[in-house]
C-alpha cells in the first residue's frame, strides 16, 4: 500500500464559525491553528495546505488568565530609530480586538509562503456579525 499524499487541487475545504466569547486566548488559538493547517483531517500532508476556513466572531470578548490583561505586552516597530511601540492586552482589546487573535494564531502557523496561505483562510470579526453567511459556515464548538 502506498502512502497517500494530498494534492492542492483535490483538497475539500469546509467553512466553520467560532465564537470567541469568554474563551481563553491560547486554547482558542491552538485549536484554530490546528484547523487552519488541516491536522484534524486524515489526509493531512505537511507540505500541502489541507486546512479549512475559520471565521472568528466576538473577538472583543476573548479572555486571558491571571494578570496578563495588564502584563501581556504587544510590540510593533515603525521602522525608524526609536520607533518601538508597545501596548498591553487591555488597550489592544479596546482599540483593535481582531489583532489579538490574529497575532496569537499567526505565531502558531508555519513561517513562509505556506503559512501565509493558511493564515489568509482565517477571518476575524470583533462583534457577533460576520460577512461570510453566503458560505454557510458550520458552528465549531471549541
From Swiss-Prot:
Q: Name one Pfam family in it.
A: Ribosomal_L13
What are the entry keywords? Ribonucleoprotein, Ribosomal protein
Which InterPro entries does the UniProt record give?
Ribosomal_uL13 (IPR005822), Ribosomal_uL13_bac-type (IPR005823), Ribosomal_uL13_CS (IPR023563), Ribosomal_uL13_sf (IPR036899)
Q: Which Gene3D superfamilies match?
A: Ribosomal protein L13
* CC annotations in GO: cytosolic large ribosomal subunit
- Do the record's keywords include Ribosomal protein? yes
User: Which GO biological-process labels does this protein carry?
Assistant: negative regulation of translation; translation
Q: Which SUPFAM superfamilies does its entry note? A: Ribosomal protein L13 (SSF52161)
MF GO annotations: mRNA binding; structural constituent of ribosome
Q: How does it assemble?
A: Part of the 50S ribosomal subunit.
What this chain does, per the record?
A: This protein is one of the early assembly proteins of the 50S ribosomal subunit, although it is not seen to bind rRNA by itself. It is important during the early stages of 50S assembly.
Q: Which family would the database say this protein is a member of?
A: Belongs to the universal ribosomal protein uL13 family.
> What protein does this entry describe?
Large ribosomal subunit protein uL13
Q: Which organism is it from?
A: Pseudoalteromonas atlantica (strain T6c / ATCC BAA-1087)
* Lineage summary: Bacteria, Pseudomonadati, Pseudomonadota, Gammaproteobacteria, Alteromonadales
Amino acid at each position: 500500500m502506498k502512502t497517500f499524499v494530498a494534492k492542492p487541487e483535490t483538497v475539500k475545504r469546509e467553512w466553520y464559525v467560532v465564537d470567541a466569547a469568554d474563551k481563553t486566548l491560547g486554547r482558542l488559538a491552538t485549536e484554530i491553528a490546528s484547523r487552519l493547517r488541516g491536522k484534524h483531517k486524515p489526509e493531512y500532508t505537511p507540505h500541502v495546505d489541507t486546512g479549512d476556513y475559520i471565521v472568528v466572531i466576538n473577538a472583543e470578548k476573548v479572555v486571558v488568565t491571571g494578570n496578563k490583561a495588564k502584563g501581556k505586552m504587544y510590540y510593533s516597530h515603525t521602522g525608524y530609530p526609536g520607533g518601538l511601540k508597545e501596548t498591553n492586552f487591555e488597550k489592544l482589546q479596546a482599540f483593535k480586538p481582531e489583532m489579538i487573535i490574529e497575532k496569537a494564531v499567526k505565531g502558531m502557523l508555519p513561517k513562509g509562503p505556506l503559512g501565509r496561505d493558511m493564515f489568509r483562510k482565517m477571518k476575524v470579526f470583533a462583534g457577533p456579525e460576520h460577512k461570510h453567511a453566503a458560505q454557510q459556515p458550520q458552528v465549531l464548538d471549541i
